[in-house]
Curated annotation (Swiss-Prot):
Substrate binds at N265, G322, I323, V324. It is an enzyme of class 6 (ligase). This is Succinate--CoA ligase [ADP-forming] subunit beta. The gene is sucC. GO terms for biological process: succinyl-CoA metabolic process; tricarboxylic acid cycle.
Amino acid sequence: MKLHEYQAKMLFAQYGIPIPKGLVCTTPNEAKESIAVIGYGPWIVKCQVHAGGRGKSGGVRIVRSKEEIQEFAKQWFGKHLITEQTNHIGQPVSKILVEAAIDIAQELYLGCLVDRSNQCIKFIASIQGGIDIENIAKEKPHLLHQIILDPLIGPQLYQSRDLAFKIGLSSKKQINQFNKIFMGLATLFLEKDLVMAEINPLVITRLGDLICLDGKLHVDSNALFRQPELCKMLDPSQEDKCETYAKQHNLNYIALNGNIGCLVNGAGLAMSTIDMVKFYGGEPANFLDVGGRVTQEKVTKAFQIILSDKKVKVILVNIFGGIVCCDVIAKGIINARLESGINIPVIVRLEGNNAKQGIQHLVNSILNIRIATNLTTAAKQAVALVEGKQCLF
């Protein structure tokens, strides 16, 4: 789960990480009057969306008057901000953060993430930060310095000092400030079950102080049950509507960019199905795991979600019935087909618990449903149908 910048900064403040004075606003008039609380300008106004690259798309601006703040707010409230990290629709803007502008001497970078490849928590710091950090990582990897954080013993001051020296901090004042920021960010990361925390840029002001100008936090969605306060920070407007709808019905759905819809039981089998589709030259439209305790109604909901993606040309159903009853799945497929009225090809592979009964239900339905005897055949058929080829298998 992603958090907005203003939410991240609220948490930063709770953990002793310095941030600029600011106010989050929900109306143009509120934005205009925010400077009475913030103080003298100039100010920075920022659209709050779950995407990077806001500055390059006009979603971040420096302003010097009430009127400019109000103009910016009127321009963006109720609109969609499109950046290099969003789709062509963009993300809706319903909040704007107004902050005191900071006189910057240097931009640094500090981040923490779960490194799944190496099965560890990794801190990364760089002497160069800002909007081009991705390019720096690609073109100047020697500027990125890393340490491993052990969750069992927590962050250590010697690790903080090591990073501070590597990114060029030398004065006692700055090293002490960096230590406080490092320890605060690491503690926040561990206590709030984060998978990514980023301060970019972490700036040195003209007065030599360190302050966090922008921040990103991603929470482990699997740990939200023990983070009730973070659950309240979810902004559904920033989420994929299909994914939100799926969560409400206890379905694990992730939208992809292809045109072959997939309905599978079990995350491992779902990933194998996606791999098989890709292997034979197709592009999956989604990951969808209906789980073990699936009902006829749940299958119908799953079909509705898949069909809401207008790119989908074929639906591939791959069910291995253990706990799941294949005849229940079959009845759900038939109901979904009749309710939707959409006549795109559906390929079904059923194995296991009540598979014969399920297949018989599908055959008797006289609908445009093809039966596959194995996953290889099912994937080949799906790809062939998308490409407009005749299925010979």
